[in-house]
């Protein structure tokens, strides 16, 4: 499930570290979180779509790796980010 260009710009503007930042770990995690939520909704109605389920698991793994990187770099920033995104209970 691809994101619309307007939604991408909205996410980038919300999570960017500086003016030209489009690929920092924060932005990537926010984009993946949005894609994961969209794909989860898709899979609720299309239970037999196994290829999308595999893609979802790959995205979750990628997000987990990025969050681990952020956590190792700065614990306080990590806690703020997951709170802002509303993930991890």
Swiss-Prot record:
Assembly notes: Part of the 30S ribosomal subunit. Forms a bridge to the 50S subunit in the 70S ribosome, contacting the 23S rRNA.
Keyword set includes rRNA-binding: yes
GO molecular function: rRNA binding; structural constituent of ribosome
Entries under PROSITE patterns matching the protein: RIBOSOMAL_S15
Protein name per Swiss-Prot or TrEMBL: Small ribosomal subunit protein uS15
Organism: Acaryochloris marina (strain MBIC 11017)
Family statement: Belongs to the universal ribosomal protein uS15 family.
A Gene Ontology term for the protein's cellular component: cytosolic small ribosomal subunit
Domain of life: Bacteria
Taxonomic lineage from the root: Bacteria, Bacillati, Cyanobacteriota, Cyanophyceae, Acaryochloridales
Alphabetized UniProt keyword annotations: Ribonucleoprotein, Ribosomal protein, RNA-binding, rRNA-binding
InterPro entries xref list: Ribosomal_uS15, Ribosomal_uS15_bac-type, uS15_NS1_RNA-bd_sf
Gene3D superfamilies in the cross-refs: 6.10.250.3130, S15/NS1, RNA-binding
Gene from which this protein is expressed: rpsO
Summary of the function given for this chain in its UniProt record: One of the primary rRNA binding proteins, it binds directly to 16S rRNA where it helps nucleate assembly of the platform of the 30S subunit by binding and bridging several RNA helices of the 16S rRNA. Forms an intersubunit bridge (bridge B4) with the 23S rRNA of the 50S subunit in the ribosome.
GO biological process entries: translation
Keyword Isomerase carried by entry: no
């Amino acid at each position: 499930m691809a994101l619309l260009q307007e939604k991408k710009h909205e996410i980038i503007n919300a999570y960017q570290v500086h003016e030209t930042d489009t690929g920092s770990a924060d932005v990537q995690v926010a984009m993946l979180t949005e894609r994961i939520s969209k794909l989860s909704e898709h899979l609720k109605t299309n239970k037999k779509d196994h290829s999308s389920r595999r893609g979802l698991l790959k995205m979750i793994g990628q997000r987990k790796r990025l969050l681990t990187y952020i956590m190792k770099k700065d614990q306080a920033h990590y806690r703020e980010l997951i709170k802002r995104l509303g993930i991890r209970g």
